[in-house]
């Protein structure tokens, strides 16, 4: 039997690569016209071997070669990791420079489980990171320069086929608010400048130009600790355009916080939650099951307490099961047999039980750290812990009803389902000294979430002058689904179909008629202020606000 003749004989590797990419694009267009599903990896391998190439072309090279008139058709099929923008936003994680943890001065040491930092085995890494996480490696390559980190990541997402019309920053790398004010201003200024292309003299100028930028900064998330989430820190973060706080809690038990050397009390956690929510922030926390002195039952009890006690009840959660990493105090306890991690199956059971407890207004952002497995001596043994936990829940007949699982974009990617009958659903609850209302547009039959709004009646304890008196605040407005550019309207996508406007109208009605408020404020990302201006809101300090008295 004759061997199949290879095409492109006599051509250079680069020339054959061009032919391969051209043929892949043609095949994808044919499949689209025939309304057929295609296994892209298999197609790439077959076409590459046909031309005698030992490896398939990179996705970024294929995306770059797609003709302009075919981009709308092919980019959704070629997009790498579509989950990255399924929520409607491109997340850009950046890291500040390595610095020591601030509570070393008080307690003499860092938390027992914490890797990284200038004094650790991973000395060029930031506190609580090893330097081998994808975000850490990008930051190290850019020498922790915020401008370069942003530009490189935005460019990378574009090359992978994602729309970066809306960007949300996550400032990682330990407690950002303990760094000198001058450095913080430089860092935030450069994040905004990287999107707008303007070279600003200060944060206020950077924010002003960022408002008009083509790539919108729709929010900034800052990682902090309860003791660096006081009034002055909250006000500084508002001036940066920050809309969400990630607060390290780890445990709701006072004895565990003490024994792991957290350097703050559980009471400080509750106070920081109330201060943050009364200033309009979304609150996301980091929680660590499997810490020393906590068994399986006690872990379950702490999450029941966390979700049911109004002193906690955050808007979002990152579940980070404890990892034993070389160079930490916990590593020494583990080596001498004084600490033992849960077996893998028990950890999957625990996470499944935690996910079953999550209320429908809370979003679980992550279920494990991004630390490479070879650096982990003991702890999580699976890289797909969330998927295993969700599979275990299916076996047990329970479901996870958190925001992320129900998002329309995630449902389209994972389950290929789209909402059929959408209706407005309202949930009220008490949290952190205030009345919270969670409004959402959902398909209740399929349990799919299209958009949400978090409304809070400001408590009398709020310290921000803009929110004093009879005032309510919208802490979050988000319509889910793949990113749609701010001025575009795609009838197959859920963003920009008017759901946001309808949610705001209902929030105004509740604030006026039920809260008895005369003013409604919104904590808005810098790039979305014009959206609220169209609805009659005006800049009021760091907020957008509007009078909602009856005669208006």
From Swiss-Prot:
Molecular functions per Gene Ontology: 4 iron, 4 sulfur cluster binding; acetyltransferase activity; metal ion binding; phosphorylase kinase regulator activity; protein-lysine-acetyltransferase activity; tRNA binding; tRNA uridine(34) acetyltransferase activity
GO annotations of cellular component type: cytoplasm; cytosol; elongator holoenzyme complex; microtubule; nucleus; spindle; synapse
KO phenotype (gene knockout): Pronounced larval developmental delay and death at the pupal stage with delayed and reduced ecdysone-induced transcription, developmental of melanotic nodules and up-regulation of stress-induced genes. RNAi-mediated knockdown results in lethality at larval third instar or the late pupal stage. RNAi-mediated knockdown in sensory organ precursor cells abolishes central spindle asymmetry during asymmetric cell division.
Pathway given in the UniProt record: tRNA modification; 5-methoxycarbonylmethyl-2-thiouridine-tRNA biosynthesis
Reaction equation(s) it catalyzes: uridine(34) in tRNA + acetyl-CoA + S-adenosyl-L-methionine + H2O = 5-(carboxymethyl)uridine(34) in tRNA + 5'-deoxyadenosine + L-methionine + CoA + 2 H(+)
Residues that, per the record, bind [4Fe-4S] cluster: 101, 111, 114
Binding site for acetyl-CoA: 166, 476-479, 499-501, 532
Domain N-acetyltransferase: 398-552
Keywords linked to the UniProt accession: 4Fe-4S, Acyltransferase, Cytoplasm, Cytoskeleton, Iron, Iron-sulfur, Metal-binding, Microtubule, Nucleus, RNA-binding, S-adenosyl-L-methionine, Transferase, tRNA processing, tRNA-binding
All copies of domain Radical SAM core, residue ranges: 84-374
InterPro entries: Acyl_CoA_acyltransferase, ELP3, ELP3-like, ELP3-like_N, Elp3/MiaA/NifB-like_rSAM, GNAT_dom, Radical_SAM_C, rSAM
Subunit structure: Component of the elongator complex composed of Elp1, Elp2, Elp3, Elp4, Elp5 and Elp6. The elongator complex associates with and stabilizes microtubules; efficient interaction requires the full complex.
Identification of the protein by name: Elongator complex protein 3
Organism: Drosophila melanogaster
Lineage, uppermost ranks: Eukaryota, Metazoa, Ecdysozoa, Arthropoda, Hexapoda
């Amino acid at each position: 039997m004759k061997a199949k003749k290879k095409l492109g004989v006599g051509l250079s590797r680069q020339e054959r690569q061009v032919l391969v990419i051209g043929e892949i694009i043609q095949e994808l267009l044919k499949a689209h016209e025939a309304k057929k599903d295609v296994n892209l990896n298999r197609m790439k391998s077959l076409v590459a071997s046909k031309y005698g190439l030992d490896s398939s072309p990179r996705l970024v090279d294929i995306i770059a070669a797609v003709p302009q008139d075919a981009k709308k058709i092919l980019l959704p099929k070629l997009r790498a990791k579509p989950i990255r923008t399924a929520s409607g936003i491109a997340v850009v994680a950046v890291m500040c420079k390595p610095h020591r943890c601030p509570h070393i001065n008080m307690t003499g040491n860092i938390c027992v489980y914490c890797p990284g930092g200038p004094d650790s085995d991973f000395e060029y890494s930031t506190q609580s990171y090893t330097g081998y996480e994808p975000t850490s490696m990008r930051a190290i390559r850019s020498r922790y320069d915020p401008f370069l980190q942003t530009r490189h990541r935005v460019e990378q997402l574009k090359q992978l086929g994602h729309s970066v019309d809306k960007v949300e920053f996550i400032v990682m790398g330990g407690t950002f608010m303990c760094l000198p004010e001058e450095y913080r201003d430089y860092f935030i200024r450069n994040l905004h400048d990287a999107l707008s292309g303007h070279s600003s003299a200060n944060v206020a100028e950077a924010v002003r130009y960022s408002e008009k930028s083509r790539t919108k900064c729709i929010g900034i998330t800052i990682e902090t600790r309860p003791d660096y989430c006081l009034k002055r820190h909250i006000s500084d973060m508002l001036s940066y355009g920050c809309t969400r706080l990630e607060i390290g809690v780890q445990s709701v038990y006072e004895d565990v916080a003490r024994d792991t050397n957290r350097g703050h009390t559980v009471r400080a956690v509750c106070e920081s939650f109330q201060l943050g929510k009364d200033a309009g922030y979304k609150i996301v926390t980091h929680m660590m099951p499997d810490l020393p002195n906590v068994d399986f039952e006690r872990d379950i009890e702490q999450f029941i307490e966390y979700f049911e006690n109004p002193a906690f009840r955050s808007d979002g959660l990152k579940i980070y099961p404890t990892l034993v990493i070389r160079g930490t105090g916990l590593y020494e306890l583990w080596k001498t047999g004084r600490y033992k991690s849960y077996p893998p199956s028990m950890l999957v059971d625990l996470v499944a039980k935690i996910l079953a407890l999550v209320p429908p207004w809370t979003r679980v952002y992550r279920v494990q750290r991004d630390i490479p497995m070879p650096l982990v001596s003991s702890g999580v043994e699976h890289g797909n812990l969330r998927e295993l936990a969700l599979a275990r829940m299916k076996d047990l007949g329970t479901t996870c009803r958190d925001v992320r699982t129900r998002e329309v974009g995630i449902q389209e990617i994972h389950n290929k389902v789209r909402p059929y009958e959408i209706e407005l659903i309202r949930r009220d609850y008490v949290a952190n000294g205030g009345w919270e209302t969670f409004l959402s547009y959902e398909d209740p039959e399929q349990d799919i979430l299209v958009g949400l709004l978090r409304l809070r009646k400001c408590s009398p304890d709020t310290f921000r002058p803009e929110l004093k008196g009879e005032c309510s605040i919208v802490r979050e407005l988000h319509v889910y689904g793949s990113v749609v550019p701010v001025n575009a309207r795609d009838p197959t996508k859920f963003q920009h179909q008017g759901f946001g406007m309808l949610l705001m109208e209902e929030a105004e009605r509740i604030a006026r008629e039920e809260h008895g408020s005369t003013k409604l404020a919104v904590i808005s990302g810098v790039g979305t202020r014009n959206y609220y201006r169209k609805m009659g809101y005006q800049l009021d300090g760091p907020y957008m606000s509007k009078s909602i008295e009856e005669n208006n």
